[in-house]
């Protein structure tokens, strides 16, 4: 219960005059208060909307009242203030922030009471009638993201839908455009898992149906369905010789390859019937790149800032400086989760534990959750559905193994996995749903981080097929792309090789990426880029 009180201040002589005018002041009459309305309603389009403007009420107070109390309670109300002029009180009601409340229907009450003297000496007060104002505040759910946001034409699959308010109102259906999900499960107030049927290429707004919602449900999520690419095997040259490739990403929506290379450059190779010459953008001290959860931004991580870049034009947008970092600490790598956050690791010139951060892509800012671990030059790798990000750390030079962590987007928490090892130069690789995880390019684990088997120690780079049935490696001994059956029982602890294909020699420092359908591999090293249909 919250109180706003005020007394009418009068001089002693005037007070006596008022009492004289009041008669005996015996309290036989109640103070009478009236108000302009007894019902106030607020609404916001979603929990992400701005706070609605305050509303103003007018109360008329009995002229003989000497004291006014305004009481309020309930989650709908942030504050109540009022000013008194003569017998009129102007009451200002400020609603709570939608972001603080979340989705739902929230209530509150405001009580206005005037008090008058109960006896001629005014030694005690008597209350008059109470005016009660009922406040109702309605906030519908919001759909923020779908992950992966790219689907493959003619292929049924499952997506993770993230938002807020999914358990505040009964969700009766999920649609991708005009097509209903085949099944869906409300996992939590912020997550729905939905299966969708085979769709044709196009863009499909993702929406939920909840008839009890107090208003239209805002959705910011679009599923982009693309045809599986049919790229011929080829190689692509760099604009400058022998770059060090720091990151390689495939933009399936726009049919483009995006690379971060040393010297602070982003390279973009677009496909339009054939691969074109690269366009470039400069980002000083560039260390990593990743597409945002919705694919609308390319996140370019430099050692001292993160810049949002248009993935089609490479035009620079919002720049967010790094949090306050200790001397010799820098922003190192990032991976994107389905909650709209990027997990950002930091590094140190040497061996030392440094902070891990989250970066919010739609309201650009860094934060450090309570569960975020301090790690030794950690490298993240994420699943395509953004549900899980794995963080390996350490160095082969360390005497003892270091713990592997993960970030679970569903709970927005970091935790240890139970696996300990020292990372090498190969980043963690995961399938679409994080059911198969490859660490150090050789060790394969299931979703519970149970060790399953190994890949060759000659692996230089690895990706996992989205459906988790294959691992594809670039092998230093064979100078080929090798394929391994992850559904088979490892013989002697090693997964069986079932295929191989000759790739154009990418050189050293190889990075790999895979198309969403699992049919095309991309390899980039210091020599060139190789585009290669995946072996069986």
Model-derived segments and their meaning:
Residues 506-536:
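Blade-level signature of beta-propeller repeat domains, shared across WD40, Kelch, NHL, RCC1
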Residues 230-240, 275-281, 315-325, 364-373, ...:
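A short beta-strand motif characteristic of beta-propeller blades
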Residues 257, 298, 342-343, 389, ...:
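Hydrophobic beta-strand positions that form the internal "hydrophobic ladder"
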């Amino acid at each position: 219960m919250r109180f706003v009180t005020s007394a009418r201040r009068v001089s002693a002589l005037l007070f006596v005059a008022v009492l004289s005018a009041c008669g005996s002041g015996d309290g036989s009459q109640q103070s009478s208060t009236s108000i302009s309305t007894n019902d106030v309603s607020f609404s916001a389009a979603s929990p992400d909307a701005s706070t609605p403007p305050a509303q103003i009420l007018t109360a008329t107070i009995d002229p003989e009242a000497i004291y006014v109390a305004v009481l309020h309670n309930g989650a709908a109300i942030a504050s109540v203030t009022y000013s008194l002029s003569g017998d009129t009180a102007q009451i200002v009601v400020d609603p709570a922030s939608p972001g603080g409340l979340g989705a739902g229907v929230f209530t509150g009450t405001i009580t206005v009471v005037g008090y008058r003297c109960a006896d001629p000496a005014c030694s005690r007060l008597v209350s008059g009638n109470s005016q009660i104002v009922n406040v109702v505040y309605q906030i519908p759910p919001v759909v923020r993201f779908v992950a992966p946001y790219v689907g493959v034409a003619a292929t049924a699959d499952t997506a993770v839908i993230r938002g807020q308010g999914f358990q505040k109102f009964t969700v009766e259906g999920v649609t991708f455009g005009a097509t209903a999900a085949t099944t869906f499960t409300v996992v939590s107030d912020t997550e729905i898992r939905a299966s969708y049927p085979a769709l044709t290429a196009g863009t499909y707004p993702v929406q939920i149906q909840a008839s009890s919602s107090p208003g239209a449900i805002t959705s910011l999520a679009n599923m982009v369905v693309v045809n599986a690419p049919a790229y011929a095997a080829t190689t692509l040259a760099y604009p400058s010789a022998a770059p060090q490739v720091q990151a390689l990403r495939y933009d399936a929506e726009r049919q483009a390859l995006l690379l971060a290379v040393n010297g602070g450059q982003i390279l973009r190779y677009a496909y339009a019937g054939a691969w074109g010459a690269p366009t470039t953008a400069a980002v000083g001290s560039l260390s990593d790149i990743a597409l945002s959860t919705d694919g609308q931004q390319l996140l370019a991580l430099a050692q001292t800032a993160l810049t949002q870049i248009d993935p089609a034009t490479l035009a620079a947008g919002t720049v967010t400086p790094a949090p306050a970092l200790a001397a010799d600490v820098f922003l190192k790598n990032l991976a994107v989760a389905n909650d709209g956050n990027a997990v950002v690791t930091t590094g140190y010139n040497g061996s030392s534990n440094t902070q891990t951060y989250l970066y919010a892509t739609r309201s650009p800012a860094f934060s450090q959750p309570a569960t975020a671990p301090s790690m030794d030059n950690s490298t993240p790798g994420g699943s395509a559905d953004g549900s899980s990000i794995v963080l390996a750390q350490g160095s082969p030079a360390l005497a003892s193994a270091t713990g592997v962590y993960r970030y679970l987007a569903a709970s927005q928490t970091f935790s240890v996995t139970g696996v300990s090892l020292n990372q090498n130069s190969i980043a963690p690789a995961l399938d679409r749903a994080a059911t198969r995880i490859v660490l150090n390019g050789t060790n394969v684990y299931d979703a519970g981080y149970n060790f399953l088997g190994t890949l060759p120690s000659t692996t230089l780079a690895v990706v996992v097929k989205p459906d988790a049935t294959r691992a594809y490696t670039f092998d230093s001994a064979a100078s080929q792309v090798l394929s391994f059956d992850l559904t088979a029982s490892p013989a002697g602890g090693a997964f069986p090789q079932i295929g191989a294909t000759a790739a154009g020699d990418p050189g050293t420092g190889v990075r790999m990426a895979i198309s969403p359908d699992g049919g095309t591999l991309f390899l980039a090293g210091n020599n060139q880029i190789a585009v290669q249909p995946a072996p069986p």
